[in-house]
């Protein structure tokens, strides 16, 4: 008995995806998505380095 008999003989390979043709609309859509992602990343970066949004603290009444 060899150790290989129990296993699969050939590895399973996924079929290669065909290169799809992209028209102008697809190219424009991809470009727009990239720009939106860049803007989102920039907004995240700006928000992460900021401090607290509200400076309210503990509210005090005027009564003593």
From Swiss-Prot:
The text of the family note is: Belongs to the TMA7 family.
Ranges of biased composition (kind: Basic and acidic residues)? 27-44
| Source organism per UniProt | Anopheles funestus (African malaria mosquito)
Q: Give the range the annotation lists for the signal sequence.
A: none
Keyword Zinc-finger assigned: no
Q: Which UniProt keywords apply?
A: Coiled coil
Tell me the segments the record calls region Disordered: 1-64
Q: What is this protein called?
A: Translation machinery-associated protein 7 homolog
- What's the superkingdom here? Eukaryota
**Top-level taxonomy:** Eukaryota, Metazoa, Ecdysozoa, Arthropoda, Hexapoda
